[in-house]
């Protein structure tokens, strides 16, 4: 049997379990800025060393990249940014890839390429917009439009279509609401 999203969840659960065991030992200690940066770099470097970026843009991978972008904003480490760019390029700056809006779905739960309107496939747009904004700040907005083309297409469709229950589960508030707020600046 191949790799499943549940394998990733097991890894994440194990990391949290180990971290929670270490928490009481470190709770009494005051951490300074350098120690926090060192820990962030250590954890993020471990992740990037042990997980290839060429994976799908579904939530189980995309959530990491939203965090990696925040680390990049803080540290400006090009290696971290390059890792996420490789992931975005691997996914052609897209979430679910069905081209025909008449076939787009959001219910019931689904991981298929036709679940374009399902937030688990839209969280990737947060990162694509961040990457686009980095290029736009360099004066490359027009040349970088491909980075947000799919996000604009999908979210415009969602914003102006009739259903009002696209965010029918709580995770969508983390996955999709930031996409909508980031799109405001595009």
Enumerate the language-model features and the residues they cover.
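Bacterial Sec-dependent N-terminal signal peptides
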Residues: 1-31
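Glycan-recognition and catalytic cores of secretory/periplasmic carbohydrate-active enzymes
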Residues: 28-186
């Amino acid at each position: 049997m191949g790799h499943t999203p549940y394998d990733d969840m097991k890894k994440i659960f194990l990391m949290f379990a180990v971290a929670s065991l270490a928490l009481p030992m470190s709770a009494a200690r005051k951490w300074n800025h350098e120690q926090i940066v060192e820990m962030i770099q250590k954890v993020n470097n471990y992740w990037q060393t042990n997980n290839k970026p060429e994976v799908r843009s579904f939530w189980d991978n995309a959530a990491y990249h939203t965090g990696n972008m925040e680390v990049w904003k803080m540290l400006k480490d090009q290696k971290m940014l390059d890792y996420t760019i490789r992931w975005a390029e691997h996914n052609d700056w897209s979430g679910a890839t069905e081209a025909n809006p008449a076939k787009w779905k959001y219910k019931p739960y689904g991981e298929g390429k036709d679940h374009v309107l399902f937030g688990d496939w839209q969280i990737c747009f947060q990162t694509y917009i961040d990457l686009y904004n980095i290029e736009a700040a360099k004066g490359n907005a027009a040349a970088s439009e491909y980075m947000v083309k799919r996000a604009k297409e999908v979210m415009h469709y969602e914003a102006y279509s009739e259903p009002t229950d696209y965010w029918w589960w709580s995770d969508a508030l983390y996955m999709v609401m930031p996409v909508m707020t980031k799109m405001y600046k595009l």
